[in-house]
Amino acid sequence: MTSRRSVKSGPREVPRDEYEDLYYTPSSGMASPDSPPDTSRRGALQTRSRQRGEVRFVQYDESDYALYGGSSSEDDEHPEVPRTRRPVSGAVLSGPGPARAPPPPAGSGGAGRTPTTAPRAPRTQRVATKAPAAPAAETTRGRKSAQPESAALPDAPASTAPTRSKTPAQGLARKLHFSTAPPNPDAPWTPRVAGFNKRVFCAAVGRLAAMHARMAAVQLWDMSRPRTDEDLNELLGITTIRVTVCEGKNLLQRANELVNPDVVQDVDAATATRGRSAASRPTERPRAPARSASRPRRPVE
């Protein structure tokens, strides 16, 4: 009785007439137990079986069965047969890069068309393209926040807002007057009147002393007339200017004469008025500050 071996199924269907000579040869009957073993036929069967495995592996397409890649059945394959690998995309070999765009929907492109992934622009470029769409309010807030930084820089322009400080030119252009607040010459001065008269006296003496020192310096320069650096150093070494201000009661008058009449500014009348009203007002008992409810009251002594 002729025995028929079952052919092992492969991924692809093998034509029927290709291996019929292997299974349906006249000598393919079962040998009797008493007959000697046929080594030549066994070797031929092993060779054909190996060739059949090679043909089956060549017909096997790994790309169609990627789910079973790396299984334990790979150990059964012949080591001499070269394996075919799927090409690795350049994006995987190049390391971390821009994120890949999602694939387009099925209805947008053709059935067999491979979607091409265009490289996305860097994040800085994307932010730069969206910057013009920001509202004007954010730009205004950014400018306001940048003002303290620009003010801290040494090269930043100074503020043009008017300040309460007086420049030296403004101080020299005023006429000086002592306070007229005391009602009579024997009345004691208040601290405010005393401070005001002190500033006026110092300003008058300073004006006259500066004028005398300037005139003395002009005379010394005209007498020596230096022409070189050595002459200037010699003049500086011997220069000694002593200023004596002895105007007496005409101190304020002589000081006011030194002021240019084109830029003269009278003393603020409000200052004198405040001093006069403070001297004429009767002394009032100062009021104690209001106490809070949580502060304990001091016991009466």
UniProtKB/Swiss-Prot annotation:
- Keyword vocabulary terms for this entry: Host cytoplasm, Host Golgi apparatus, Host nucleus, Host-virus interaction, Inhibition of host innate immune response by virus, Phosphoprotein, Viral immunoevasion, Virion, Virion tegument
The region called Disordered is annotated at 1-171, 269-301
InterPro entries for this protein: Herpes_UL49
Q: In chain numbering, where does the motif Nuclear localization signal fall?
A: 163-166
- Which protein is depicted? Tegument protein VP22
Compartmental location: Virion tegument; Host cytoplasm; Host nucleus; Host Golgi apparatus
Recorded source organism is Human herpesvirus 1 (strain 17)
Main site of residence?
A: virion
Q: What is the effect of changing residue 141 to C?
A: In strain: Nonneuroinvasive mutant HF10
Its annotated function is as follows: Tegument protein that plays different roles during the time course of infection. Participates in both the accumulation of viral mRNAs and viral protein translation at late time of infection. Modulates the RNase activity of the virion host shutoff protein UL41 probably to ensure necessary levels of key cellular mRNAs and proteins. Plays a role in microtubule reorganization that occurs after viral infection by stabilizing microtubule network. Finally, may prevent nucleosomal deposition onto the viral genome by interacting with and inhibiting host SET.
